């Protein structure tokens, strides 16, 4: 069995959109500084790198699944040209209600990836920028790390208990 690092997309790989907004065009998709180098380090350390992302913009009709897949293909291509390999991307296109098994904090995307790609979740990591990301990792049996913006307040940092904190990300 292999090990993986599961990465959330918005706020970890690319700049997070303002609250209540969605990235539906490539022109609005901005990869964060240092992401390609970080993914390349994970690749060299022997981890599969898998993106797991909630994308309810599809359920809201703001973007088709085909367009979302094209955006993810482009993200993968841009990162690959910078020496960073994304092995797979899983997304949840559903609305928050009714509940599904793939929308984080549910572990469905991680469990599916593990089953399809032979991943040992106990030796894998979930890295995200939200409580839902960390919960998904915990629910799947992964180790977890939480990325926080450089401008996070001390109270925001204090309430993060389940994950290792990775500070210094300008998201």
What kind of region is each of these model predictions?
Residues 1-48:
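Active-site neighborhood of HAD-like aspartate-dependent phosphohydrolases
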Residues 23, 27, 60-63, 97-102:
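Pocket-edge positions in alpha/beta enzyme catalytic cores
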Residues 14-16, 60, 135, 155:
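Conserved protein kinase catalytic core
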Residues 3, 66, 70-87, 95-126, ...:
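Asp-based, Mg2+/Mn2+-dependent phosphohydrolase catalytic module
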Residues 55-68:
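A short secondary-structure junction motif
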Residues 36, 42, 47-52, 68-82, ...:
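Short Lys/Arg-rich amphipathic alpha-helical segments
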Residues 53-58, 91-96:
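Short linear capping/connector segments at secondary-structure termini
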Residues 7-9, 53, 128-129:
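Active-site flanking residues adjacent to catalytic metal/cofactor-binding acidic residues
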């Amino acid at each position: 069995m292999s090990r993986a690092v599961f990465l959330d997309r918005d706020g970890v790989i690319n700049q997070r959109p303002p609250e209540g907004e969605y990235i539906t065009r490539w022109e609005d998709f901005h990869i964060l500084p240092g992401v390609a180098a970080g993914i390349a380090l994970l690749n060299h350390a022997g981890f599969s790198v898998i993106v797991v992302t909630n994308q309810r913009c599809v359920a809201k009709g703001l973007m088709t699944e085909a367009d979302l897949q094209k955006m993810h293909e482009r993200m993968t291509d841009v990162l690959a040209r910078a020496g960073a390999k994304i092995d797979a991307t899983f997304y949840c296109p559903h609305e928050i209600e009714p509940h599904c098994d793939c929308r984080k904090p549910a572990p469905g995307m991680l469990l599916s990836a593990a089953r399809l790609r032979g991943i040992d979740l106990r030796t894998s990591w979930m890295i995200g920028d939200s409580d839902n990301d960390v919960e998904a990792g915990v629910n799947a049996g992964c180790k977890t790390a939480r990325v926080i913006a450089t401008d996070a307040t001390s109270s925001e940092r204090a309430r993060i208990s389940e994950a290792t904190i990775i500070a210094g990300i300008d998201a």
